[in-house]
Amino acid sequence: MAVPASPQHPRGYGILLLTLLLKALATTASACNHLRPQDATFSHDSLQLLRDMAPTLPQLCPQHNASCSFNDTILDTSNTRQADKTTHDILQHLFKILSSPSTPAHWNDSQRQSLLNRIHRYTQHLEQCLDSSDTRSRTRWPRNLHLTIKKHFSCLHTFLQDNDYSACAWEHVRLQARAWFLHIHNLTGNTRT
């Protein structure tokens, strides 16, 4: 006669649950840890590519009055997840605007492609990190921050259209992109130290 299996002890379930939780946390940590070394160089290298991509214009540009202001104090956060989401959103908008087929002829296309590839790779790494951290955190991203960023980039697109995608209008956008890379540097530097 077979001996009936003894029922599993409740502590056994607790240990199993704890093991699974620790494994999930370790996966999340490893998915995000690879960003730390990249954070240190991403903005600096991107700024260098942006500078190399768009040499100085042969003519002086008139002062453009683009009403695309952005209150950068809205970006202040010590929450790594929120900083990652914000950085991801900014990079998606930068990628979209800089990959436009109407960029000026004097821009170095290979440098622009290198910058776009860099943005794309970093965005993918952020997506992996955000996807893995979704398993343990469901904090909501401030909607007004998302809308403010979206409104700013929409304004830049309109500005380009209104100025017929002129080289001077693109110079204004390039300067805005420079400011965004500096914001990203501050976001990632403040939350991963």
Swiss-Prot record:
Glycans are attached at N65, N71, N108, N186. Residues 1-31 form the signal peptide. Belongs to the alpha/beta interferon family. Has antiviral activities. It comes from the Eukaryota. SUPFAM superfamilies: 4-helical cytokines. This is Interferon type A1/A2. Keywords: Antiviral defense, Cytokine, Disulfide bond, Glycoprotein, Secreted, Signal. GO terms for cellular component: extracellular space. It is found in: Secreted. PANTHER family: INTERFERON BETA, TYPE I INTERFERON. Disulfide bonds join C32-C129, C61-C155, C68-C168. The gene is IFNA1. CDD domains: IFab (cd00095). One of its GO terms (biological process) is response to exogenous dsRNA. GO terms for molecular function: cytokine activity; type I interferon receptor binding. SMART domains: IFabd. Its main location: secreted. Pfam families: Interferon. The keyword Cytoplasm does not apply.
